[in-house]
Amino acid sequence: GISKPVQKSAANEIREGRFCKKCGARLEYSFYHYSQLGDYKCPSCGFKRPEIRYDAYDVKVGEQLSFAVEDKHLVANYKGFYNVYNILASYAGLRTAGFSGEHFQDMLNHFNPENGRMEQFRIQGTGVTLNLAKNPAGFNQNISAVMQDKTPKDIIITINDNAQDGTDISWLWDVD
C-alpha cells in the first residue's frame, strides 16, 4: 500500500466503497488516493485498512513513476498514479512468494504494457498513448494521468459498447 497522501486532487473524486463492509456505517478517511484506496476506518465497529506490509514511499508521478519499497528505489516509464499500485502489487506478490526482488527493476525495464494499458505507438510520425478504461475509477485515473503530463497534446475519447467489452456504458455517468 501507500501509507501517506500523494495526490491532492483525489479529495473531491466520487468514491467507491464508502461504507463499512462489516456494519454498513460510513467510513472515515484520514486521506484518500483514488476510488476506495486510502487510509480509512469505521467509527462504529473499528474496521480499518489492514496494516501495510509493503509500503511505497517517496512516490513521484510525472513523465515516469518512481517510488521506494523496502529500501529499493524503483523507476518505471509509465504514467498514471494507479500504476504505482500495479507495480507495488507485482512486487508484493513476488516477495510474498518468497523471491528476493533483486531483479525487479530489470523486469520493469523490460516490461512492455499492451492491449491499451498505457500502450505507446506512432501514427504517421506522431506519438500516441492508448489507455483503456472499463470503470469510473479507471477513467478518472486516465484523466489524472493526462492532466499530470503538462506537455501540449490533443485528446481523443472514444466509447466502445461492443459485446466483448460490455454493452452497458452507463458507468460513464459516474466519471468525474
Which residues make up each language-model segment?
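A conserved, hydrophobic alpha-helical segment in the catalytic core
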Residues: L37-P50, Y78-N109
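Extended acidic/charged loop-beta regions that coordinate divalent cations
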Residues: G1-H73
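Active-site beta-alpha connecting loops in nucleotide-dependent enzymes
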Residues: A10-R18, G24-L27, E114, L132-D176
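A short glycine/serine-rich beta->alpha loop
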Residues: H73-F81, G127-T129
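Gly/charged, well-structured mid-domain segments that form the phosphate/adenylate-handling core
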Residues: F47, K60-G62, G93-A133
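Conserved active-site and cofactor/substrate-binding residues in soluble primary-metabolism enzymes
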Residues: R15-R18, G62, Y82-L88, F99, ...
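Fold-independent oxyanion-binding glycine-rich loops
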Residues: G1-S3, C23-A25, C45, G93, ...
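Short glycine/proline-enriched coil/turn segments at helix->beta-strand junctions
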Residues: V69-K72, S100, I123-T126, T151-P152
